[in-house]
Amino acid sequence: LLRLNAPSAIAVYDGSFEVSSGLRVLKQQLDTSTAEKDPEFVQLIISLLSLHKQLIADQAIYQKLTKLITELAEKYAEVDIYNDEDQFKLLVTECSTIYKQTLSRLPSRIQVKGEPSKLQDEHNQELVRCGLLCAMRSVFLWRQSGGSRWHFLFKKQTILNAAKQLISSPLRE
């Protein structure tokens, strides 16, 4: 999220190894030989792509989001969030606030399902919003790379093969 001027998508994530857990989930959801599927997975992807489209159409919110993320990246440029739990929690809270100030103001809302007791917990809500903000960054990279909603729906095998390749042979920055 905070790597704004990275030379490549791989550099945004510090290499594909850093997103290997996400690649495994993607593989599990797209692989027809896997029985364990989350029916909400594809819906979440479609919702994120739709939200991206609305964000691009609303220049005021888009510019506000860009400004807030740029400020956040500058603030955390020298902070080691991987080894400082307090700073990491603060970053999650700030990302959640940015999500509430921008993406949650768009007409479409992403519905998160789960146990009400866990969803009502404020820290869990912040983690979800932070995750959705980071997911939106990935949607931007997907779109910048030529990806579309239709690609996700009709080129699943190509995406699955790419995920398998990145899992078996991770790319480094």
Where are these regions (language model features)?
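Charged, amphipathic alpha-helical oligomerization/scaffolding segments
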Residues: 43, 47-50, 54, 64-67, ...
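Long amphipathic alpha-helical segments with strong coiled-coil/leucine-zipper propensity
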Residues: 2-85
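Conserved binding-pocket/active-site segment within a compact domain
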Residues: 77-147
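Alpha-helical oligomerization segments
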Residues: 127-173
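Exposed alpha-helical structural elements
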Residues: 18-21, 25, 64, 90, ...
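Charge-rich, low-complexity amphipathic helices
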Residues: 70, 77, 117-121, 150, ...
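Residue-level signal for well-ordered alpha-helical segments
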Residues: 3, 25, 32, 42, ...
